[in-house]
Amino acid sequence: MTEKVHFIEKILSALEKSGVALYQITETREESAELFFIRRALDMQRQKEIRQAAVTVYREFSEGEDRYLGSAAVQVQDSFTEEQLEQMFRDALYAAGFVKNPYYELYHGTGEPSPQVLEKATHLSDRSLAEVAGCFADALFAEDTEKDVFLNSAEIFATRTTCHIVNAKGVDVSYCKGRVTGEFVAQCTAGQDVETYEDFAYDDMDTQALRRKVRDTLEMTRARAQAVTAPPAGEYRVILSGSYVKEIFSYYVMRSDMSMV
């Protein structure tokens, strides 16, 4: 928390020294736990944290009876010195003087930090990233039980993003959200040696959905390995199931859209 406040305070100090009176700071802190697998063995694990902020500088000015509020945005890192920040903000303030947006009021806040909003319904923000990544790793390999078809490799990325928004009119709010992404390669060595690539992304702890995806991918990969040459062209009875039904009907839905006429 101290580091977070320090970064914001450094930006605020540089804004004041640069003569900027109107501003909005959107600081983002992204933490991640990453797992890399070869077959079922954990090959590498990594944790990282990226902290940066988007700073919008506003400049109020008039020409005749017309009143404007120009703006310019810059992206800053916590590694920047205060001197670097001051120069960037002075340049942004100068650039904002050429942007003739009709004047409008910035959103007003209370001047007090609002309680952080956690997306608790997802159950991702209130667990450690290592725990989240571990749960999805368990789900990923739960269906990998056969010898002829298996997961060749996999990657899992559990991320948590904290966003902190501060402006010159007293707004001070923050929120936190979690997300899990990754990819895996299924391989079947019975018959033809084939591989199937899949990726995934979840905003909640739906590990069962990942299990189903792995199970379906393994089954499809085995079917591909056992595939034979297509029969001659003609009329055949074909049964579609699962996601393939949705996929074929999406063609007709798209073609019936008014924009396609």
Regions found by a protein language model. Give the residues of each.
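Active-site bordering "gate/hinge" segments
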Residues: M1-V261
